[in-house]
Amino acid sequence: MPDMLRGAGYTTHHVGKWHLGYVSEQAWPIQQGFDSFFGFLDQFLLRGPHTDAGYNLKRPTYVNPLLQRDNGAFEKHTGHLSDILVEEAIDLLGRVKEQEQPWFINYWTYLPHTPLTPATRFASKFPDTPEGKYNAMLMQVDAAVGRVLATLDASDLTRSTLVIVVSDNGGTEKHLPSNQPFIGAKNTFTEGGLRTPLLMRWPEVIPKNVVIDETVSYLDYFPTLESLV
């Protein structure tokens, strides 16, 4: 995807979770066609780099995470992971606005992945239960996406920007049966594992408040975006 977009004249940027390989540097975002990267190559690397002894399971995942920029070393960042990533995405929008080239930002938040660790300002709105923490993390995702959309609006980028919001899989049943009424969960091939929302916003191109019942696959994204550029 980034190679195709760069070939069409776009600058390409990845913010957040990578999760597409980290043992070999050839699998890292910069080597895979992104002009910039800020985030983490694997969820366990939020706790620090792997060693022969493993990694520190006791270190928090979401709080004061260890993150990487481009091909650089891990650096500790202060705050909640979601806040740090959305601030990076917003800062990036400010930079690409000033350039003449079109741009692509791949913003992969980690929420609401386990461990269930919402920021305090969201956790305080819900009961201190697995369900409450999960709902707080969903609210935190909504707030982060809302900030990105508001930045696009304020920067006069909304009309020319296609926004796609999607999840990679259904919820895990490790903590709560979050996929009801669908059967199954993450790591299964039933609806509970595969059926996720797909939201798209592109004013003057995609009509508002339209629900489409057709099945969409991740395999559709590449040819669809390729046809648009």
Go through each PLM region and give its residues:
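Formylglycine-dependent sulfatase
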Residues: M1-V229
